[in-house]
């Protein structure tokens, strides 16, 4: 049987990782850490899921490691006695206050030592599994790929038999949506109750005395948006209704993204994509572009068109007869300016792209995507 040891925080990501490992046939040992965190309710939630798994005849060894005396001397808003937990978007600058210095290096070091011990005792290979993901990279340096590459190298140099253990980080390039999709699949394979398992988790950095999530910390916002992206209501208990926490999360996301767009885009790009404006004909940089390559959304880098789909319509705006198969461009009825038209918007970030008309090449279905140059970014294909 395959063997794994992992850090089970009691949050969404590590819980999803646990059910994935079990679905993949691993025998799993879990370590949870008590380090003086304000949201220690996560440890109770972790134990609830271990107990639920036992009722389903799935046995997982679970140990809680007490690091309070060591880590309570660290400075972080996440630790008892630290400053108040900031609210807002999970990528906002103020969320750096929730970084606990060197936390993941400490956790990984203990896991590595435990994995070596299991490998020696059971004479087997052991995977060290962690649920870190791309959404953590912006704020938490110890969740980035280069950190784990360096840590694994250092630990291998400092231990005998290091060839028997290795890191397994399946979500490193994914996000919370990726994680939830994976958990849905894993719980289905195992015949487990997805809602019950994720009701028994805590992601909030500032739950109330009853363990209910605030819905306002950066971690909450990211989780709420992930559930909503999949058309799901989060089964965890919040201090207010799901509709209220979702409305707040969507507004926080909108404001954060708008601030980002204002900083990054030119005035015309912002006007076109975020205010549904239109550039003047024959003024955009791509209306007569002839090079081979791909066209991406200027706001979110989502692939929209390829140069093979572009044609010269003579209208003064970039014209395409087909969208990329994975573009999923949204079509929206537009009755502005006394006209009836079909607006096209990016499916990923809702950027206004232009309009679609029925005067395109018949050989390709007769449609013409009339796109603002300001809404797209062209990347030339290397020969």
Segments and roles (model prediction):
Residues 1-194, 220:
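ATP-dependent adenylation/nucleotidyltransferase module used to activate substrates
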Residues 59-61, 190-201, 267-273:
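Short, surface-exposed acidic
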Residues 109, 203-225, 295-304, 350-351, ...:
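Local cysteine-cluster metal-coordination motifs and their immediate loop/turn environment
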Residues 131-134, 204, 278:
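Short linear capping/connector segments at secondary-structure termini
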Residues 182, 186-229, 234:
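Accessory C-terminal segments flanking Radical SAM cores
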Residues 212-245, 304-313, 354-355, 374-382:
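Iron-sulfur (Fe-S) cluster-binding segments and ferredoxin-like electron-carrier domains
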Residues 253-383:
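A short Gly-Trp-Pro
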């Amino acid at each position: 049987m395959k063997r794994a040891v992992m850090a089970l925080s009691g949050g969404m990501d590590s819980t999803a990782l646990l059910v994935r490992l079990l679905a993949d046939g691993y025998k799993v040992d879990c370590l949870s850490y008590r380090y003086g965190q304000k949201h220690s309710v996560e440890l109770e939630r972790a134990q609830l899921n271990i107990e639920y798994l036992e009722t389903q005849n799935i046995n997982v060894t679970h140990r809680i490691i007490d690091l309070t005396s060591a880590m309570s001397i660290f400075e972080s808003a996440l630790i008892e006695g630290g400053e108040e937990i900031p609210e807002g978007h999970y990528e906002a600058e103020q969320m750096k206050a929730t970084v606990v210095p060197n936390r993941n290096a400490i956790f990984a070091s203990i896991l590595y030592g435990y994995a070596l011990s299991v490998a020696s005792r059971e004479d087997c290979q052991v995977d060290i599994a962690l649920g870190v993901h791309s959404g953590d990279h912006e704020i938490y340096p110890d969740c980035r790929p280069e950190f784990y590459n360096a840590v694994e190298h250092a630990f291998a140099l400092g231990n005998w038999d290091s060839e028997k253990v290795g890191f397994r980080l399946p979500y490193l390039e994914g996000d919370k949506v990726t994680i939830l999709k994976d958990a849905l699949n894993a719980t289905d394979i195992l015949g487990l109750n997805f809602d019950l398992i994720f009701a028994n988790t805590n992601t909030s950095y500032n739950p109330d005395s009853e363990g209910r999530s605030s819905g306002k910390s950066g971690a909450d916002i990211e989780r709420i948006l992930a559930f909503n992206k999949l058309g799901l209501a989060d089964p965890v208990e919040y201090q207010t209704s799901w509709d209220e926490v979702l409305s707040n999360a969507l507004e926080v996301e909108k404001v954060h993204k708008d601030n980002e767009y204002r900083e990054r885009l030119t005035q015309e790009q912002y006007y076109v994509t975020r205010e549904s404006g239109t550039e003047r004909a024959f003024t955009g940089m791509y209306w007569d572009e002839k090079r081979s390559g791909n066209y991406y959304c200027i706001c979110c880098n989502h692939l929209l068109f390829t140069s093979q789909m572009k044609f010269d319509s003579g209208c003064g705006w970039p014209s395409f007869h087909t969208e990329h198969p994975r573009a999923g461009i949204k079509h929206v009825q537009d009755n502005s300016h006394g006209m009836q038209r079909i607006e096209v918007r990016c499916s990923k970030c809702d950027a206004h792209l232009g309009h679609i008309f029925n005067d395109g090449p018949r050989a390709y279905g007769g449609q013409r995507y009339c796109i603002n140059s300001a809404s797209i970014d062209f990347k030339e294909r290397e020969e």
